[in-house]
Amino acid sequence: NNYCKIKCRSGIHTLCKFGISTKPNCGKNVVKASGLTKAEKLEILKQHNEFRQKVARGLETRGKPGPQPPAKSMNTLVWNDELAQIAQVWAGQCDYGHDVCRNTAKYSVGQNIAENGSTAASFASVSNMVQMWADEVKNYQYGSTKNKLIEVGHYTQMVWAKTKEIGCGSIKYIENGWHRHYLVCNYGPAGNIGNEPIYERK
C-alpha cells in the first residue's frame, strides 16, 4: 500500500506495518468493542472544539499559574476519516503507547493516547478520557520553557492553534479481568513542534 512510501525518521508507518484493516489484533484478550460509535466521534469533536474555544477566549482559569491567555486565532477542528483509520489500526493492536509513524501525504500527524482500566464491569467513556488530556492545563505555564511534555503534552496538542483535523480510534477489551478502554486520537497538522508557541496570544 502507499503508506509504505511515507517515511518517518522514527520508523515504519503503522498502516505499512499492520495493513489497512481495522480488525483488532489483541491476542488472547476479549474484545468487547472495536471502533468509535457515531455518537462518540461527535462527542470527541465537540469536546475538543468547546475546550479550544474556552482557552482561545481566555476563559480557562487553571494553570501554573492560571489563567491561560486568550488566543489571536484557533482553528475549529474537523473530523478526518484517514486520521481515524490510522488511529483505529493502531488502537486495534492493544499495545499501549505511541506508534512510530502515522503521517499522511498531506501533513505530519500528532497523537494523544489514553488508557483506562477498571475491575468494575464497565468501560470509561471517551469524554472522561479526553477530559484527562484537557485537565493537564493545570500544569501549564504559557510562554515558559520549563513546561514538561510528559505533564502537559496532551493539553498542548488539544489546543494547538494550527491543527485543523482530528481522527480517533478506540478499543474496549478485557485483559485478565480488567476492563480496558484504549483511545487514540491523531491530529493534523501535528502540534508540539519544537519551540513554537501553542497559539499566539491576543
From Swiss-Prot:
Domain of life of the organism encoding this protein: Eukaryota
Predominant localisation class: secreted
Database matches in Gene3D superfamilies: CAP
InterPro entries in the cross-refs: Allrgn_V5/Tpx1_CS, CAP_dom, CAP_sf, CRISP-related, V5_allergen-like
PROSITE patterns: CRISP_1 (PS01009), CRISP_2 (PS01010)
Domain (SCP) ranges: 46-187
Cellular compartments per GO CC: extracellular region
Organs and tissues of expression: Expressed by the venom gland.
Localization, UniProt: Secreted
Classification via SMART domains: SCP
Record key words, sorted: Allergen, Disulfide bond, Secreted
Disulphide bridges: 4-16, 8-101, 26-94, 168-185
Family from the record: Belongs to the CRISP family. Venom allergen 5-like subfamily.
Protein name as annotated: Venom allergen 5
Highest classification ranks of the organism: Eukaryota, Metazoa, Ecdysozoa, Arthropoda, Hexapoda
